[in-house]
Each structure stands twice: as structure tokens, then as C-alpha cells.
Amino acid sequence: MKNNVKRLLALILALAMSLSLFACGQKQDGKQDDVQADTTRVFTDSCGREVTVPADVQKVAVSGPLAQMVVFAIAPDKMVGVANAWDETAQAYFDEEYLSLPLLGQLYGGKGELNLETLLAAAPDVVIDVGEPKGSLAEDMDALQEQTGIPFVHIDAYLATMDETYAMLGDLLAMPNEAQGLADYCRAMYDRVKAIADSVDKANILYITGDEGLNVIAQGSYHAEVIDMLANNLAVVDEPSSKGTGNEVDMEQILNWNPAVVIFAPGSIYSTVADNENWQTIPAIRDGRYYEVPMGPYNWMGFPPSVQRILGMQWMAKVLYPDAADYDMYETTQTYFQLFYHCDLTAEQYAALTAHSLAAD
């Protein structure tokens, strides 16, 4: 992580030097730029950093996929690019203007690091990082901000406090009304599902990932927030992984855990377990209590663990405790898609999304 940021800073410095040579030739006829100072204000981010930002932010870049999802809900028209290319499933839901946004890359993790030339060419008013703070985050933000001249801010995002995340975004972007609607929704849906979780005998479950089905999302990890709230997560390990792939285990351990319900991540082995002798001995598989997480336009349970988990937790509550979760899942999904993806979900699209994801009536 540290090496990645250091490499970025070196690239920024080299690029900035080349740009400064070009700028020298422009100053003679650019005096009007000196007399038109932008109106700014100070924004305090979740790291406690006081960052000078434009009072009227119009162009936003995101540092990674978590921020991409969160910011898209409130200000899609302010985004100058995306951290990751949209998943193919997004094409059915998003307008072309959003699908064709430039690819900026991401600051932490992932396959593609931040594309500095594209970022600087996009000239954002601010770069927004959203999620769980990394150990060196404040220092990284300060260094990148100093080298690029672009404000970098971090806003914490946790499942239980997504309303606070949107309140801070609303302040930063001067969009209080839009932020309030999203914040109120996140608060109400979290509280609804938390009330369900507090009222039931929790099911013993495993969340399985990986193309061989030998990875689990362990209790206590950032990725397990929904699972740990709604169920008795049997995957207890010494060092829960912070990665979306989870912790690798063996089949013997899965058999020993003996889950009553199994949730499979998209792209895992959901479609083959019914014919696998080892898996057939597990109560969840034998009794037909196994499900695949809906995928579209993102994995509803996270990975990356962003705001879409607000929808995922409502889905998981419906799967595990249908009597307590006495809401219509199609209407619930429609509302989420309208608020966060700015699209109307058809009954046919919903049926395709949840084909392997709901208990049979």
C-alpha cells in the first residue's frame, strides 16, 4: 500500500514538472486567471483534516469503487470518471453517459492504480475517498493533495452509519436535500433490519466465496457486517481477512461447521453443490436452504462493501426470516434502484436478479 502511494507521488511529480513547462508559456496572456480566485471554504473530513475546497463543487473524482457507489447515488452528474469499469450487468440499468465516463483507477487495492494523467486532465474540484480508513490514510491524502493541487477528502462509511456518510457528502457537495433523502432511507432500512435481527433466533450460516467454494467471510471482518448482524456466522478464525475473497479453509472445516444455511457469492459454486457428495452431507444443501447473492449492478452483499449492502441486508433478512421480514422484496428493490441507481427496475429484471436468491413460495 505504502509503495503504491509512493510510486503515485513520483509519477505526479514528473507529470507536474512537464505541465509547469507548458504553463510558463501561457502566463504572458493569462493575467485574467490571477484576478479570478475561486470561492473556497474549509471542510473537515473524517480523518479530522481541514481541507480547503471550492464552495460550489461541480466536478468530483472518486478514489475507489466504494466511493464510486456512494457518490453515484447523490451526484452522478458531478462525477468526472469512475474508479473501476462498471460491471457488465450495469449496462441494463445505467444511462450511456455514466457508462462512458473515463476510467481513473483506484488509490488502494484493486487491479488498476490511480491514472494520474486522466485524473489531472479531468480537473476535479475534489477527490473523494469513502470507506474504512487505512492506517496511513491521512498522510497519503495530504501527500497526494500537496503534489496534485487537488483537494483529497476521506469520509468514513460503515453499515450502521451510512446516514452520517451521506450527511457529510451533502455538506461537502452543497446538496443537503439530496443527502437528507438518502440518509433517511439508509437510517430507516438499517433500523428495520436491525429490529428483525434482534427479534429472531439467528440462523447458523456460512458465506462462501471463491470458484472452488473454499473461502469464507469470517466473523468480525469489515465484509461480514451484514452477516454478523443477521445470523450466527459460523466462520470464526484467528485472523479474519480484510479482503473480499475472505479466508481460505478446507472442506473438512466446512463440514465441521455444519451450517443450516449457506449463502454463496456470485461466481462461486452455487450451481454445482447439489451434485457434490461432500456438500450433500451439509444440512443447508440437503434441505435446500442455500442461496446465491444477487449480482446486478453489484454484488448486493458487498465486495466492495459499500452502500449496496443496505439493499443486501434487506434481501438477507427476507431469505432467513421471511415471516419477520414482512415486506415485498420487489418493491423494496425498486425503491433502492430508484434512489441509488436512478433507474426503474422492471419485474422481469427483478426476476432475473433473484432467480437463485429467494426461498421458493
Show which residues each predicted segment covers.
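Bacterial N-terminal signal peptides that target proteins for export
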Residues: 1-12
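C-terminal motif of bacterial Sec signal peptides marking the signal peptidase cleavage site
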Residues: 19-23
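Extracytoplasmic substrate-binding proteins
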Residues: 50-52, 139-215, 237, 294-358
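Structural recognition of the beta-strand scaffold that forms the well-ordered cores
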Residues: 61-63, 80-83, 103, 126-130, ...
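A short, structured surface patch at a secondary-structure boundary
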Residues: 67-122, 126-133, 232-235
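Alpha-helical, coiled-coil/dimerization segments enriched in small aliphatic residues
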Residues: 108, 216-245
